[in-house]
Each structure stands twice: as structure tokens, then as C-alpha cells.
Amino acid sequence: MKSVGLITEYNPFHNGHQYHINQSKKLTNADVTIAIMSGNFVMRGEPAIYNKFTRAKMALSTADLVIELPATASLSSGDHFAELAVKVADYMSVDTIAFGSENNDIKTLKQLAHSINEIEQSESFSQKVKEGKSYPRIISELLEHHEALASPNNILGISYLKAIAKNAKNINAISIKRENAQHHDSLIQHHQFASGTSIRTSIISQDDHWHHVVPKDIQHLYVTPHITLNQIFPYLKYQIIAMTTDSLKNIYTVTEGFENRLKSNIYEATDFHHFVKLLKTKRYTYTHIQRLLMNVLLNIKPTDVTSNIHAVKVLAMNDRGRQYLKHLKTAFPERQYITNINKSNAHYFTNEIKATHIYNAISGQQQTDFNTPVIQQYR
């Protein structure tokens, strides 16, 4: 079976995602579409608006198979996120990865991926790091502000291409142009596509503008409980106050004395966004700081972070997904394709299980990795 992989967060699933899946399948003639999706915490450095089980159900309206991306990938830089996602795709024997971009010029993106690899090895790069500049700013400066780097999706696409070249040369890549909505649009316009940011804003504001930008047949899933950063803050504040400076120093992505900034600013902060502003320096982007804070909340240490895939968690599948999974289990009997977590296989998913428990403690939800079987759809 020919497969196409989509590296996603679906926070939440919307018409743009449906378009992306359908176009990916059409352009690759794939028999099966595999969504590799972030779990309960996402790359923006925040909890997903809906839990991973609800979002997997949403995705199954169009995708055939939904696989959970390791939690530490979702709370890492773009390059590590991409590297682990590509390794999951390779573990799933994906033929092609299809990603969204603003310019839809795969040749240019591949050239940029090659150029960035060279830049990262240069003395100029090392010098600018010492000057305290953020990674995105350094790359932008050394590539003379290439216009393709103005788009978050292009930047992430370049990270996928770098990861494929390094770890999975057997995987092809295609780029699909995003339709209408821009990544950071904060308001829903009057057309069928909208950004995830604007949809989350609409849902949290409890207006009904999101109705026309998500698939009609799954709209009932969008009225389930959701979670926000303000709900997270009291738990995060407790964690930072309770932890010693040395303990904070040992959290994944906490470097260069940032543990001291956490301790010295936590008492003044009135809410999550205020805290992030107090912590901001020219070296770190807001998103990097938010991911760091989620690592503090989840108590993720560098030793928890894997660079290899030893098992994957299947969140949802339909008939085609089941057929493909059966094919994989026959072709790769030594690999661990887990549909239901139990005591014998839970050690593969320690971070994901913990993230779900903490997400539930804050949101008051009850779905765990142990009591929620793989979501199945029969057609």
C-alpha cells in the first residue's frame, strides 16, 4: 500500500487540514494517509485546546491512521520536532511526507535546507550565538533575510527536509500551498479557511464564527471541554516555587542560568502571558520560553528525551488504516505498533502517559492512555 504521511498538531482540526489531507492523497496517489499528531501539549508551548483523543477523532474524519508524536518532540525546537516526526514516519514506512507551505516551491526549500545545514557549521553562526541572538534571527541574517523564512510553515518545512536528508533518504517530500488563512491570523474571515489561532480564539470566546471553517460532520466534537494557558498557570507557579534552583537547572531546554530568571520572576507574574513577558530575552523567542515552561510543568529532563523511535502509539484508525497496520506488523514483526497501552508496554510511553495525567489534572477530564482504547471507525 502506498502511504503519505502528514506531520500535524490539529489544534484543532479544521477545513485547511482536510484540504491538506485530500490534496496530499491526490498528488501522491496514496492508498493510505497517516497523520503523525502531537499529543496533549503542542509545539507552541501550550496545552492542546482539546485532548489528543478528541483531536484524533476529528482527524479520522479525513485521515486513515493517527499516530501520536512523542511528547518531547512537541516541546522541542523545530529541528528536533522535525527529526523525531520524520523518524516516526520512517518507522511507519511512509513513502512521502506532505507538508504545508506558503510558497509551495519545494526546490527552493530544499536549497535553503542545504544552505542552513552549512550555515549551522560556520564560525559566523557560532559568533552570533555568543552575541545572544535567537536562532531564527541568526538564520535570517546569514541568509540575507530570504523571504521564504518569513513564514513559520516554510521554516518547519525546511526542518523536515533537513531531517529527511539526514535520517530517512528513502522518504520523498512534497509541499502543498496553504489556502488563504495565514498561520498567525487572529480573526476568522468570511471564507472557508481559517488559522488555528483564530479558531481557538473563537472557541475560547464562545462565539460561533468557527462553525463554517471546520468540517460539518464533526462539529459536535468542538463543544467538548477545552483547556487554556490561564488554567495552567497556578500549577506552573506551584511547580517553580516548589522546585529548587538546581532542580530547575536540570529541566530539558533550561540553559545558561535561565533557572534563575524563573525563580526571580515567578512572584511578580500575574498570569501566564505576563510571566512569559518577564522572562523574555533577545536570545529566546516567546515560543521557546513557552515550550520551556511546559517542560517545567511536566518535569521533563534531558534524560527523558529520546532521539530514536522504539514504539509508536496508534490513536485512531479506519478500515484502510487497519489494513495498513496489519501490513506493517507482517512486514516488520520486530517493531512495536501499540494500539492499547497496558502494563507490559507502558514503559515506551512514560512521557506521554504523564502528560495526559497532568493535562487531566488541570482540565478535570478522565480519558487516560490506559482507559481509552484505540479509536476505530468502520465504513
Swiss-Prot record:
Swiss-Prot/TrEMBL GO biological process terms: tRNA modification
Sequence similarity: Belongs to the TmcAL family.
Organism: Staphylococcus aureus (strain NCTC 8325 / PS 47)
A GO term, aspect molecular function: ATP binding
Listed transmembrane segments: none
Protein name: tRNA(Met) cytidine acetate ligase
Reaction(s) this enzyme catalyzes, per UniProt: cytidine(34) in elongator tRNA(Met) + acetate + ATP = N(4)-acetylcytidine(34) in elongator tRNA(Met) + AMP + diphosphate
Coiled coil: none
SUPFAM superfamilies, per the entry: Nucleotidylyl transferase
Keywords: ATP-binding, Cytoplasm, Ligase, Nucleotide-binding, RNA-binding, tRNA processing, tRNA-binding
